[in-house]
Amino acid sequence: MGRGMQKQRFCLDTSAFTEPSVRKALGVKTVTELTDKVMDLIAEARIKLNISCHIPYPTVYNELMGFLENENCPRDVIVKVDTWLVKKTPNRYEIKIPSEIFYEYVKDLRERINKGMRIGEEHIIKATDMVYELSKKHPEMGKNEIINKVLSKTINTFRNKYRSALRVGTLDSAPDLDVLLLAKELDAAVVASDGGIEKWAQRLGLRFVDASDFPFMLEEYLKHNDRHLRIKY
């Protein structure tokens, strides 16, 4: 067992097992295949280096299970997840978060809500103008036809802009928050590919590891551990 690694802990978000760039780098196509490979690395790192990997339960764990079940994941991969990932519910009543962090989050959320409202207003005005212009140019078109034509052009743009304003770069779900709380409780590094989780992990002074780097980090740890053992013996 490697020394100096006893305190290495990681708290994993669902994206640690679903990140497309990691699948491509490891030569796998599905979430199941990536989970299988990552779990093998986690198991080896646990045995050789005492590195422990944790997953918030039930929120993030259930998210991961949902992805795996959708792919009809084999039972042996589920067993690996249940064996090598430490499932734990964050102690939400005992974890202390500075009030300044809470203030920043509420301020950020308020700004996003206001931005979302402006985007909604802009698209309502735009849609109204389009309906007016279409009804003038094509008086033969029926009401429903005009509405459907306008919505098909504006709804996707609105959704993308609204989603970006409200969700990108912030915490927008209970699982996201649980990853940070559990990492804070355990003094663990956060593993994710979510910009919001990364941003607030930095605010909380937590170590952050991008999900796309995590498997290769474990491989590097294990490679140097094996080299050390060869030199030693």
UniProtKB/Swiss-Prot annotation:
Its EC number is 3.1.26.5. InterPro entries: RNA_free_RNase_P. One of its GO terms (molecular function) is ribonuclease P activity. It holds the Pfam family PIN_5. Keywords: Endonuclease, Hydrolase, Nuclease, tRNA processing. It is an enzyme of class 3 (hydrolase). One of its GO terms (biological process) is tRNA 5'-leader removal. It comes from the Archaea. It catalyses: Endonucleolytic cleavage of RNA, removing 5'-extranucleotides from tRNA precursor. The keyword rRNA-binding does not apply. Belongs to the HARP family. RNA-free RNase P that catalyzes the removal of the 5'-leader sequence from pre-tRNA to produce the mature 5'-terminus. This is RNA-free ribonuclease P. It comes from Methanocaldococcus jannaschii (strain ATCC 43067 / DSM 2661 / JAL-1 / JCM 10045 / NBRC 100440) (Methanococcus jannaschii).
